């Protein structure tokens, strides 16, 4: 690809980025239903959930378009850090999902519950503190390989350490790039086979 890479601008998440970021999540992880509108809602719901529990955001913008995001949560995972606006958004999206595709929605919710259970188990079996989490890292497939994910992850980790975290954790599925995380000083402390 001999194209010139445009400048990448990094800044905190803005509500106007929501649709573009949700679309990235949809392309990466939320494409199981034949109903595209449902997939869109599911991705948006996932994003709203991540935003509701995060204390830090960084978005990569290329040519005016949000192409990547990192979210993190520093400090105790108490209700103090929960963002009501995004919780309400998540709830509204869930009810739309339920109306549109009740079965797919039920499946998504049981997947989310299972994931939370698994993540909590993994956390208990690892020596990590329960707070200080990189809650989301997603980069548009079209810009993979440009180092955008590295900058975003480093920004999230820097935020956590500026809040006094000596360790941070993130959850990932098995088809992620382990090498990428290892290069950033992460190592697998626990795994779960679904």
Task: Name these PLM-found stretches.
Residues 7-23, 74-75:
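A short beta-loop-alpha structural element at the N-terminal edge
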Residues 35-62, 67, 71, 92, ...:
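Active-site rim helix/loop that mediates acceptor-substrate recognition in acyltransferases
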Residues 77, 169-171, 187-194:
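Conserved catalytic-core motifs of GNAT/GCN5-like acyltransferases
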Residues 76-132, 194:
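Conserved acyl-donor/pantetheine-binding loop and adjacent beta-alpha core of acyl/acetyltransferases
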Residues 135-144, 169-179:
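Conserved beta-strand-loop-alpha-helix junction that forms the acyl-donor binding cleft
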Residues 120, 150, 162, 174-191:
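Conserved active-site alpha-helix within GNAT-family acetyltransferase domains
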Residues 139, 145-158, 183:
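Conserved acetyl-CoA-binding loop-helix of GNAT-fold acetyltransferases
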